[in-house]
Amino acid sequence: APAAFKTIKTHLSDYSRRVEDYDRIITGDLGIFGSDMLYELLRGEGIEIADRHEDCGKLMFSPEQNVNCGASGCGCAATVMSSWFLPKIESGEIRRVLFLATGALMSPVSSLQGESIPSIAHAVVIEHID
């Protein structure tokens, strides 16, 4: 979530964009826990994305499966983007998205030693063009 937060904040600032300029802001994957953390971090900067945000990890599982931390970032981001969002963009149902592939280097040893978890978020804008 911290990397997605920084990337979204920087993107909006660098390109003079607003959240409202996007039909969806898509992450892959933060899961339920990470999405809530992202909302909290962005709200601290006066940025509200909850009504436009979709997370590939959250979409891949039903709420009954109780997978609070999502799926495999690279796997679910590619799967959900290509099977769910790209057809909607191609048809024009969705016009513009900010897509962030998120990832973290999860090391049980580092976590047990109290070290931080390195994370990254790459962003790309995908648009439907008539």
Question: Residue locations for each model-derived region?
Answer:
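Phosphate/pyrophosphate-binding loops at sites that engage ATP/ADP/AMP, CoA/4′-phosphopantetheine
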Residues: 7-21, 88-89
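Claisen-condensing/thiolase-fold acyl-transfer catalytic domains that form or cleave C-C bonds
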Residues: 23-130
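Loop-centered beta-sheet repeat module
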Residues: 1-2
